[in-house]
């Protein structure tokens, strides 16, 4: 077969495989609609074509997530490296892969003497889990980690690297000092780059998995997380491009893209902490021009986080495990629950103007006053700006 036709065939098979539950659901619903008069009447009343597609999407999603995970690879002879294991997703993933999935785990911790690192050592006491110091901004420490992994594989292959370490700062773009934006990129982007480039030769040899933890924020940016969204968009772009480059080696690259979850990265600051950071880092003139908006914005951020953040962080860990162990892996693993998945999927496909309108409904209603030049809440009395002197 011609190489182009061969690639087209493989691509079609991959699409059919990844979305098999949706095709099956659509076919089953069409057959049932012909056999069951009541179902046919309901679909016709709702608009047959549209209702059929919606029902297929819902049932396909449920089937994919709950029943059709497909075969998994065996963990025997395989090791994994995880960054950011001090707390959160990385900490729980390290325990899951070592204890339940029986992988050899190298758990990279920013602080190898932290409570989280000590807990890992206590829970997994044999040679199945190694806690190693790993600051993803430190190139020398990453090289040390590579040497340690090579020396302690004990006949295993490095099957997967999960680049999980990440940081976030909830501040609007104008308020964040350049040094903090550089730090976000150093951890979230360059940290992923450093770790990936260092361990790619081992992953190519094992024909394994490179798993990059991104975020839904990498697909649509909202207020107060613009630099964070920029970093996660870069990670998604890296995963898509690198996956295409590594396909010839049999190495798969995937992203895990969580929604908001109740972890330290989202709940590490109170409203008072945010205001203190704002007063410390933002020039006085800009503080005055923004008026009461920052206090309301911080209250809005925390209120939104409490309302939409999902409590079960094991949903994310489950998807991380799937990315490592699925025999037919996805390209992108979403962690959001059905309702959030449906809403965010709809938002992703809207044009930018519609996205702007949709997002604006959930933000504090402030506008700049033409006379004073100050940012005022809509409906608040106008203030005349008085120049000093």
Predicted segments, located by residue:
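The beta1-alpha1 cofactor-binding region of Rossmann-like NAD(H)/NADP(H)-dependent oxidoreductases
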Residues: 114, 134-147, 178
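Active-site Tyr-X3-Lys motif and surrounding loop/helix of classical short-chain dehydrogenase/reductase
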Residues: 144-148, 171-175, 179-186
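Conserved NAD(P)H cofactor-binding loop of Rossmann-fold oxidoreductase domains
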Residues: 164-169
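Active-site helix of classical SDR
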Residues: 196, 231-234
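Canonical Rossmann dinucleotide-binding motif of NAD(H)/NADP(H)-dependent dehydrogenases/reductases
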Residues: 61-107
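C-terminal beta-strand-loop-alpha-helix "lid" module of Rossmann-like NAD(P)-dependent dehydrogenases
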Residues: 249-305
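Residue(s) in the substrate-gating loop at a strand-loop-helix junction
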Residues: 215
């Amino acid at each position: 077969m011609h190489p182009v036709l061969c690639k087209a065939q493989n691509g079609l098979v991959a699409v059919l495989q990844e979305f098999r539950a949706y095709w099956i659901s659509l076919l089953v619903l069409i057959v049932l609609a012909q056999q069951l008069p009541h179902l046919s009447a309901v679909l016709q009343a709702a608009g047959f074509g549209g209702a059929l597609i919606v029902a297929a999407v819902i049932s396909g999603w449920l089937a994919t997530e709950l029943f059709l995970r497909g075969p998994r690879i065996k963990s025997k002879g395989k090791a994994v490296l995880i960054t950011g294991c001090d707390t959160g997703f990385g900490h729980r993933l390290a325990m899951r892969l070592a204890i339940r999935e029986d992988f050899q785990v190298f758990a990279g911790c920013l602080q190898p003497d932290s409570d989280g690192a000590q807990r890992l050592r206590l829970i997994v006491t044999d040679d199945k889990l190694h806690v190693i110091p790993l600051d993803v901004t430190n190139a020398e420490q990453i090289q040390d980690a590579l040497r340690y992994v090579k020396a302690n594989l004990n006949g295993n292959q490095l099957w997967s690297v999960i680049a999980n370490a990440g940081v976030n700062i909830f501040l609007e773009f104008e308020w964040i000092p350049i040094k903090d934006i550089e730090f976000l990129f150093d951890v979230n982007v360059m940290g992923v780059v450093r770790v990936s480039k260092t361990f790619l030769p081992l992953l190519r040899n094992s024909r394994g998995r490179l798993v990059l933890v991104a975020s839904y924020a990498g697909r649509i940016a909202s207020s107060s997380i613009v630099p964070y969204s920029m970093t996660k968009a870069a990670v998604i772009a890296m995963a898509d491009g690198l996956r295409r480059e590594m396909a010839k080696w049999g190495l798969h690259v995937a992203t895990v893209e969580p929604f908001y979850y109740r972890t330290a990265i989202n709940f590490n600051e109170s409203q008072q902490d945010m205001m203190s950071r704002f007063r410390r880092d933002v020039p006085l003139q800009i503080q005055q021009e923004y008026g009461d908006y920052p206090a309301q914005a911080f209250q809005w951020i925390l209120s939104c986080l409490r309302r939409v953040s999902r409590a079960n962080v094991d949903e994310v860990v489950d998807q991380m495990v799937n990315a490592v162990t699925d025999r037919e892996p996805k390209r992108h693993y979403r962690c959001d629950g059905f309702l959030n998945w449906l809403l965010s999927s709809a938002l992703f496909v809207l044009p930018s103007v519609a996205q702007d309108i949709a997002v604006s409904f959930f933000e504090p209603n402030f506008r700049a006053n033409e006379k004073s030049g100050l940012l005022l809440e809509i409906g608040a009395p106008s203030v005349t700006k008085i120049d000093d002197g």
